[in-house]
Amino acid sequence: MTVVVGVKQSPDSRAAIRLAAQEALYRDTTLIAVMAYPAERGWSPAVRPGAERLTRADDRTIAEDLLHQAVSDALGDAAERVEYRVVAVADLAGRALVHVAQTEDAQLLVLAARSGIAKVLGTVSQYVLRNAPCPVLTVPE
């Protein structure tokens, strides 16, 4: 059993990561931080015009590094108390989250939800709510 949290390439995921970590500690289970990235090669923001394109392995490594950094930034010193793994998936975000939740036997899936004017759930949240194999918790960004 695990707790899965969706992580975006923005600081907005911090609250979701913190809450997911609390849930993982409470449930005495592993936190799995998931980031989806485009299946096309060379998606990284590090790629500039004229720079060499990245391979798929490079893309995965960059996404995993971003995930580790996001968890570390969100949890600070508390990251040492939480057992966590990172999973980078070359797919659409909703499908990636549901797939990881299924394969990792998730007890809970945590997502950052839109706030402000965009309080309506986005397409990723809608997909996850319809297809997740476990309860879904949305956290305001």
Residue positions per predicted region:
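A short acidic, glycine-rich active-site loop
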Residues: A51-L66
